[in-house]
Amino acid sequence: MSIQQKLWGGRFEEATDAFVEAFTASVDFDKRLASHDIRGSIAHATMLERLGLLTREELQAIVSGLEAIGAEIEAGQFPWEVSLEDVHMNIEARLTQRIGEAGKKLHTGRSRNDQVATDVRLYLRTEIDRICGMILRLQTALVDLAEREAATIMPGFTHLQVAQPVTFGHHMMAWYEMLSRDYDRLRDCRKRVNVMPLGAAALAGSSFPLDRDYTAALLDFSGPAANSLDAVSDRDFAIEFAACASLVLMHLSRFSEELILWTSAQFGFIDLPDAFCTGSSIMPQKKNPDVPELIRGKSARVFGHLFALLTLMKSQPLAYNKDNQEDKEPLFDTVDTLSGCLRAFADMMPHVRPNRSAMYASARKGYATATDLADYLVRRGTPFRDAHEIVGKAVRLGMESSRDLADIPLEELRSLSSVIGPDVYQVLTLEGSVAARSHPGGTAPDCVKRAVAAARVRLAALQGS
């Protein structure tokens, strides 16, 4: 493209170097902003007509032209040109080509600096809403599983060593709680995304009396940005979203690690559906948990995008710099990666099959009811530190003879403490242990059912909002 054909070419005498033109272009990736760019342009044009800067006929031509361009893009028929650099210039050039002189008036009172910042916020606002819906879908799957397995006993771990018995339903509700925090963070992030830069122009605002409140209302923003310099240079909202996404994926990675462990022969706690696993090219017996493994790996990718955005912004003076073009690809890939991982998990979890007998057998190993014995002694007047010492000796006694605490005869237990009576065996069963944790937030089956009921109320309210 000759320099005369560039929309900004008036000041230049020489054409842009062909390599530089390709190197600086962003249309290959920022064209995903097209629908938001068109929406922002229609709102801007509507405001210009209200001010008398466009005639009614010019506004109608611009709106119909932009809508036709949107249809072209949707149909895959739009003639994108790298020489026009980005999504904004491609759409504006096409508009002028279609409707003539009126198209040249659209950019009145506007810069690509406030235009792109507005587009990205519109895009991200939409994606946050969609991602929040995906989180609710996954949470619903977890709550369904928790309800079915409210009384299924499994070992709880600390340091990956058997610690105390819990229920599988309680474990699923722990995952649910992590995702609830993720949902709330994203909704809070959306508040700061939902601020309109349009009207800030290049950096100093516009000499036209733009009605920014009116434009913000048309675009469903909470209001216009308060400072024009900040409006065009701010990418905090993108960084904050990447941080929120990183936390979601950190949680999904933790879930994945547990699923991977639980499907192994060494645990055998669950079976994943074949549709979410693959085999080996050499080992016929293998059923590999590829989906959770890949989600665990993809979390690192999004963590990298967060640091890329932080590093991108850390040395930039006010206001806009070309560096900011590099915010799109990490942001877009963060959205895509998070969306894919949430969908995979939500599709997979309804089909997870727990192996109840394997979980129960594992919970009987590792002296999981030792704390219950200590609590029993405390209730009979033994100071906790003394009770801890006594139970430690009981565990050693069991280890030396390969017996569980529940299998040690009463006489031997009484040799460690005279307050131990025949009723001790009620607290040494796995069922008794989990049933004893009946306070709010506990692992008792009744507590899990109450947590499930509360979660369903919350999910119904959020899905209906």
From Swiss-Prot:
Disulphide bridges in this chain? none
Q: What is its main location?
A: cytoplasm
Keywords in UniProt for this one? Amino-acid biosynthesis, Arginine biosynthesis, Cytoplasm, Lyase
By its UniProt entry, which PROSITE patterns does this protein fall under? FUMARATE_LYASES
Q: What biological-process terms (Gene Ontology) are attached?
A: arginine biosynthetic process via ornithine; L-arginine biosynthetic process
Task: Name the SUPFAM superfamilies on file.
Answer: L-aspartase-like
- Quote the Pfam families the UniProt record gives: ASL_C2, Lyase_1
Q: In which pathway does it act?
A: Amino-acid biosynthesis; L-arginine biosynthesis; L-arginine from L-ornithine and carbamoyl phosphate: step 3/3
Q: What is its EC number?
A: 4.3.2.1
Listed under catalytic activity are:
2-(N(omega)-L-arginino)succinate = fumarate + L-arginine
Q: What class of enzyme is it?
A: lyase
| Protein's cellular compartments | Cytoplasm
Q: What are the GO MF terms of this UniProt record?
A: argininosuccinate lyase activity
Segments passing through the bilayer: none
Cellular component aspect of the GO annotation: cytosol
InterPro entries assigned: Arg_succ_lyase_C, Argininosuccinate_lyase, Fumarase/histidase_N, Fumarate_lyase_CS, Fumarate_lyase_fam, Fumarate_lyase_N, L-Aspartase-like
Family label = Belongs to the lyase 1 family. Argininosuccinate lyase subfamily.
Q: Cross-referenced NCBIfam families, in alphabetical order?
A: argH
- Protein name as annotated: Argininosuccinate lyase
